[in-house]
């Protein structure tokens, strides 16, 4: 049982934010095993052109994972293929997760800007 526990990646997400911020992220918390597939959703209501996914690992600086501008990927800082973004429109940016590793346990944050 101890091995199974070690093989799980725990993803913590930013808590519920007031709607007046204009950016929401769901789900609030996510715990998944290495074989599960899940998605994180970022939605902005500010009319911004750019959206971002960040990763904050314990005792490490904030890491920029993906940048999308006008629904096109602008930057991908050598993120492993087990993280797959999807930007169906300028208001939504998904982060699809699969086959996660223990080192993927982190706080994942989304943001938007002009």
From Swiss-Prot:
Role: V region of the variable domain of T cell receptor (TR) beta chain that participates in the antigen recognition. Alpha-beta T cell receptors are antigen specific receptors which are essential to the immune response and are present on the cell surface of T lymphocytes. Recognize peptide-major histocompatibility (MH) (pMH) complexes that are displayed by antigen presenting cells (APC), a prerequisite for efficient T cell adaptive immunity against pathogens.
Protein name: T cell receptor beta variable 4-3
Subcellular location field: Cell membrane
Keywords for the protein's UniProt record, in alphabetical order: Adaptive immunity, Cell membrane, Disulfide bond, Glycoprotein, Immunity, Immunoglobulin domain, Membrane, Receptor, Signal, T cell receptor
Family matches, as Pfam families: V-set
Complex formation: Alpha-beta TR is a heterodimer composed of an alpha and beta chain; disulfide-linked. The alpha-beta TR is associated with the transmembrane signaling CD3 coreceptor proteins to form the TR-CD3 (TcR or TCR). The assembly of alpha-beta TR heterodimers with CD3 occurs in the endoplasmic reticulum where a single alpha-beta TR heterodimer associates with one CD3D-CD3E heterodimer, one CD3G-CD3E heterodimer and one CD247 homodimer forming a stable octameric structure. CD3D-CD3E and CD3G-CD3E heterodimers preferentially associate with TR alpha and TR beta chains, respectively.
GO terms for cellular component: plasma membrane; T cell receptor complex
Domain Ig-like residues, every copy: 22-114
Signal peptide: 1-21
Disulfide bonds: 42-110
Residues of this chain annotated as glycosylated in UniProt: 76, 89
Major location (coarse): membrane
GO biological process entries: adaptive immune response; cell surface receptor signaling pathway
InterPro entries: Ig-like_dom (IPR007110), Ig-like_dom_sf (IPR036179), Ig-like_fold (IPR013783), Ig_V-set (IPR013106), TCR_beta_variable (IPR050413)
């Amino acid at each position: 049982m101890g091995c199974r526990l070690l093989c799980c990646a725990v993803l913590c997400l930013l808590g519920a934010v007031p709607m007046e911020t204009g950016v929401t992220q769901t789900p609030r918390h996510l715990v998944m095993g290495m074989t599960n597939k899940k998605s994180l959703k970022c939605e902005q209501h500010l009319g911004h052109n750019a959206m971002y996914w960040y990763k904050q690992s314990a005792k490490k600086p904030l890491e920029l994972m993906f940048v999308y501008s006008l629904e096109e990927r602008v930057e991908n800082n050598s993120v492993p293929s087990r993280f797959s973004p999807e930007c169906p429109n300028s208001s939504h940016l998904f982060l699809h997760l699969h086959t996660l590793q223990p080192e993927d346990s982190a706080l994942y944050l989304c943001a938007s800007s002009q």
